[in-house]
Amino acid sequence: MFWGLIMEPNKRYTQVVEKPFHISQAAMDISTGDNDPCQVMVVVDGKNFLVCTLQKGKIIQVPLDLYFKSGDSVSFLTNGKCNVHLTGYLDPEFEEDLEDEEEAEEEEEEEEAPPLVPAKNKRKLENANDATANKKAKPDKKAGKNSAPAAESDSDDDDEDQLQKFLDGEDIDTDENDESFKMNTSAEGDDSDEEDDDEDEEDEEDDDEDDEEEEEAPKKKKKQPAAEQDSTLDTSKESVDMSKLSKSQKRRLKKKLQQQAKQQPQVNGVDKPKKEEPQQKAEKKKPEAKKEEAPVEKKEKKQIAGGVSIEDLKVGSGPVAKAGKVVMVYYEGRLKQNNKMFDNCVKGPGFKFRLGSKEVISGWDVGIAGMKVGGKRKIVCPPAMAYGAKGSPPVIPPNSTLVFEVDLKNVK
């Protein structure tokens, strides 16, 4: 919001700031006064501060960046002969605070007003509270609505009582009322209108499905085990006249039958394979175990020159390592006597050397020869093909047999 002040010569303008404001510019009115300079002063805490000096033909306006907050006591004055215009704007944050306060006041007023519950939802809440008390009275009401003949037999009355008990056994009313209660407490007034429309559509769909339900209900009921049929109501056409049921009773009967159909055990032998699953898994594991054992049986230990023993843990498929070729390997070396690891290289480009050039121990020159890239070999080197009687103190003791696992990474 715009803020402005026109200052006349030699007049003091004093105020206690109510709304914070910002001064952005001071401009001289060149139609007033003479050519003498005009000084703009501001008084804060009893002290005079020069803001700017204006003069016709030289400086007639100056940009400013002055901010005054609520509660500040401030005065403005000029000592020249020209009118000076101070312009700026009110603090927008202050305006937002005012709007927030107004909104808060409006919200408080709305909260004080009693909430209005739609008549339809109010009826549902009352039904939820009185569900237990009305269970005994429901058969009479349903009979009145359906205009049952006065000369009905006692068996028909018993069937209606059993049907009512069957429908009331699941406490469907309570679930529906609880759901509507949650929706009413969390939704706005507009949402309640949408709910009414949805419920009307559901009622229309239920009316269309009523004829199908009369045929489906007996079929679903026949699938129940004998024990459950004894303890619940037989809803076949022979014992229940579906035409006497109200819409709400038909809906509740449909839900009841659907839930019982989900809970009943399968009779077509579907459950039996579940019990046999562990046996099937065990049978599947046996061939897999044989497959894993197969390569182990094929592993053969070979003894080559110098008493070196080799065993291919994995046969590669790449180029073959031959004498004179540069090979790159990952390896891990252990002492045979205690299985203590004394050296390894399992990261980076690997260990590189020329095979057969005596750059490594003799056991490696003969043990790695013949490997293919991608293969892994276990090499057992006797002392004579390793570090001999001297060993390599302090890591390798004298006369030590060494065991290496070597991965061939590349051959050049």
From Swiss-Prot:
It catalyses: [protein]-peptidylproline (omega=180) = [protein]-peptidylproline (omega=0). Its EC number is 5.2.1.8. Residues 95-304 are annotated as: Disordered. Inhibited by both FK506 and rapamycin. Residues 324-412 form the PPIase FKBP-type domain. Its main location: nucleus. The keyword Nucleus applies. GO terms for molecular function: DNA binding; peptidyl-prolyl cis-trans isomerase activity. Residues 247-257 have a biased composition (Basic residues). PPIases accelerate the folding of proteins. It catalyzes the cis-trans isomerization of proline imidic peptide bonds in oligopeptides. Binds double-stranded DNA in vitro. This is 46 kDa FK506-binding nuclear protein. The gene is FKBP46.
